[in-house]
Curated annotation (Swiss-Prot):
Residues 151-160 have a biased composition (Low complexity). Palmitoylated. Probably palmitoylated by ZDHHC3 and ZDHHC7. Residues 249-366 form the C2 domain. Residues 398-604 form the Rho-GAP domain. One of its GO terms (molecular function) is GTPase activator activity. This is Rho GTPase-activating protein SYDE1. It comes from Rattus norvegicus.
Length: 735
């Protein structure tokens, strides 16, 4: 399998000397093989200095062929036999593994096998007379310009240059690299024991096996016990233990240190080596510890439960954290508290990320923990990114005057406010908890980006944004992020003075008087606030449906429309802290907005709906007149033949007996909608406070919306109760 590669290798090593050797071998094959007696080795003649470069040295008598050649050739395959006959190598020269040079050939000749196909076999036994002293020089020795070896017997010992070049080319073959790396350790040791010290194979294995430099261990400073040579494709051995504590730089952040203004983007690789200095209480049982990593206060990684040791806890954990505008890295050591059955922090340390990576990408730190302990860790910053360029705001956070001039919106009101208010008034006035419930954060982020790109192209239809709470949340976010609040300091003072005069009354102030409070505002702010107050007044008029009274709306929009601190200093409590003053501010905000909503004219109140379906109006039943002149006869209901229907079956029976006065459209009414489409309503509004049934006009006042084709089951329940009450009464029957 490896014959073509072996031939190519030998052809490169021999070069142009192959042809003369073949000719000499052809002459030798014509002579009869003679058995020669073993002779003692003769000293190799040397060439003296000053002799001519082309002078030849007398050759020793030719060595006859061995009789084992024929048996050896018969045992080979045809292809191997042709290759051996072509090279004219005697069987004594063909052996696997290293061998010592025999008589009649140079001392440095080797059998070079660049691809170890099989495990090496022990070398074949050689005649005793062919052994040479190990003190003889290996390879040709040059003195001046004259070679010491005879020219007729060409030496096959080559310098490591061609072998190294071949080795570098063979690195591209992954299969050979794998096989060589698997066999290098075992075969190198065997060659080191069997081959002489001066053998070329013992020094080079494809000329790329270099002895590994001694790596001092961390603990004792001794060499790694695993020795030998590394073949192509091998990597250096991994250190056996963690670095010594002296390799870590002490790091400590003061208690008054603040987060740096700069931020960090990229990927942080954090390797934890151990915890030291955690001195447990004498006599205490070992605790279960874990390490929690936080980036800017957000938990990002956590180790499993670890059993604490006497003084040092060895760790081997690696975490890869994606950083986005990161500033602080905090490591918390948590200990299990069996009393409360949860982990409690027992030590913590902080690292300022932007400062430790100045001029380098990796740091080995011994982070000081408070109140005690050290955390040994290696921090590596890879794939560092530049801070994203700040995008100029186009809608959110932009002054109202600038936004209106850019959009050229009619009425001097931004488009985002007009679109949101229009959608809320169209389909959200009857939603319970309007402006109190929050929508999806992801959908709000998507809608915010759409407004930032192009406010005119945003569509807020129900098909695109079915959740009305997303639109209300976007509107409140926009008002909250305005550089200047809509209710400015001058308007705030005006409203406080109006509140000091007495309870707000629309009759006392009048429509123009209430709107006149906004005259101190600029044109854009006055138009925007007027639109918002009209909208909030309309929302509060539907408080029976959405539960949003003026007080609830003031709680939601007070901190949004007013700045954080506008309470005059004289109203603040003396000696009060910032928490008390902020609570007073929040209360004042609610009172100011509540006053404005109560005194604001309700010009957009929905008109009443006079045309209500006649079959939905409750009609007064005429009194029942019965002749009572005869004697009184008490009757009791007779039992029915079959089992009575359960009381839960409310809707069984024939409704036609009710007559046309009660339900003039009873048949069409009952055959129309299905009960599955019936919606519920509040039962507390069925009767007045006095307990008397409502009149027709009172019932019609409730319908301030278009006719709803859905039915009300509670009206049927009330009707059934009235019928059961009438049927259960005892009546006098005249006989």
């Amino acid at each position: 399998m490896a014959e073509p590669l072996l031939r190519k290798t030998f052809s490169r090593l021999r070069g142009r000397e192959k042809l003369p050797r073949k000719k000499s071998d052809a002459k030798d094959r014509g002579r009869p093989a003679q058995r020669s007696e073993p002779k003692p080795p003769e000293p190799e003649p040397r060439v003296l200095e000053g002799s001519q470069a082309g002078a030849e040295v007398p050759l020793s008598p030719e060595t006859p062929r061995s009789p084992a050649r024929g048996a050896y050739l018969q045992s080979l395959e045809p292809s191997s036999r042709r290759w051996v006959l072509g090279g004219a190598k005697p069987p004594e020269e063909i052996s696997l593994g290293p061998r010592t040079p025999s008589s009649g050939e140079p001392a440095g000749e080797i059998w070079y096998n660049p691809i170890p196909e099989e495990d090496p076999r022990p070398p074949a036994p050689e005649p005793v007379g062919s052994q040479l002293a190990s003190s003889e020089p290996e390879g040709p020795i040059l003195q001046g310009a004259a070679p010491t070896s005879p020219p007729t017997k060409t030496s096959r010992t080559k310098s490591p240059g061609p072998a190294r070049r071949l080795s570098m080319k063979m690195k591209k073959l992954p299969e050979l690299r794998r096989r060589l790396s698997l066999r290098s350790t075992r075969t190198s040791r065997e060659r080191e024991r069997t081959a002489p010290a001066g053998s070329v194979i013992s020094r080079y294995h494809l000329d790329s096996s270099v002895a590994t430099p001694g790596q001092a261990s961390v603990a004792g400073g001794t060499r790694s016990p695993r020795g030998g040579y590394l073949s192509d494709g091998d990597s250096p051995e991994r250190p056996g233990g963690p670095p010594s504590p002296t390799a870590f730089r002490p790091y400590e952040v003061g208690p008054s240190a603040r987060a740096p203004p700069a931020a960090l983007w990229g990927r942080l690789s954090l390797h934890l080596y151990g915890l030291g200095g955690l001195r447990p209480t004498p006599g205490a049982t070992p605790r279960d510890l874990c390490c929690l990593l936080q980036v800017d206060g957000v938990a990002r990684a956590r180790t499993g439960p670890l059993r604490s040791g006497p003084d040092f806890l060895r760790l081997d954990h690696t975490f890869h954290l994606e950083l986005e505008a990161a500033r602080l890295l905090r490591a918390l050591v948590l200990a299990w508290d069996p009393g409360v059955r949860r982990h409690r922090p027992c030590a913590q340390g902080t690292v300022l990320l932007p400062t430790i990576f100045r001029g380098c990408q990796a740091q080995q730190l011994a982070v000081r923990l408070e109140p005690q302990g050290l955390l040994y860790a290696k921090l590596t910053l890879s794939e560092q990114q530049e801070a994203p360029a700040t995008v100029e705001p186009r809608v959110f956070g932009l002054p109202l005057q600038l936004l209106v001039e850019r959009e050229q919106s009619p009425g001097q009101v931004p488009l985002i406010i007009r679109k949101c208010v229009g959608q809320i008034e169209c389909r959200g006035l009857r939603v319970v908890g309007l402006y109190r419930l929050c929508g999806s954060a992801a959908v709000k982020k998507e809608l915010r980006d759409a407004f930032e790109q192009d406010s005119a192209a945003v569509c807020l239809s129900e098909d695109v944004y079915p959740d009305i709470n997303v639109i209300t949340g976007i509107l409140k976010d926009y008002l909250r992020e305005l550089p200047t609040p809509l209710i400015t300091q001058p308007l705030y003072q005006v409203v406080l003075e109006a509140m000091a005069q007495g309870h707000p009354s629309r009759a006392s102030l009048g429509p123009e008087g209430t709107r006149g409070l906004l005259s101190c505002l600029p044109d854009v702010e006055r138009a925007t606030l007027t639109l918002l107050l009209d909208h909030l007044r309309l929302v509060s008029s539907f408080h029976t449906h959405n539960r949003m009274t003026p007080q609830n709306l003031a709680v939601c929009f007070g901190p949004v429309l007013l700045p954080a601190r506008q309470t005059p200093s004289r109203t603040r409590l003396r000696g009060s802290g910032p928490g008390v003053s902020s609570a007073v501010d929040f209360k004042r905000h609610i009172e100011v907005l509540h006053y404005l909503l109560q005194s604001w004219p309700d010009t957009r109140r929905p008109s009443e709906t006079p045309d209500v379906a006649p079959y939905l109006r409750p009609k007064r039943q005429p009194p029942l007149h019965l002749p009572l002149d005869g004697p009184e006869v008490v009757t009791r209901p007779r039992g029915r033949g079959g089992p009575e229907s359960p009381p839960s079956n409310r809707y069984a029976g024939d409704w036609s007996v009710c007559g046309g006065d009660l339900l003039p459209r009873g048949r069409d009414f009952l055959s129309g909608p299905d009960y599955d489409h019936v919606t519920g309503s509040d039962s507390e509004e069925d009767e007045d406070e006095s307990g008397e049934p409502r009149g027709t006009t009172d019932f019609e006042d409730e319908f301030d919306a278009p006719f709803n084709p859905h039915l009300n089951l509670k009206d049927f329940d009330a009707l059934i109760l009235d019928l059961e009450r009438e049927l259960s009464k005892q009546i006098n029957v005249c006989l």
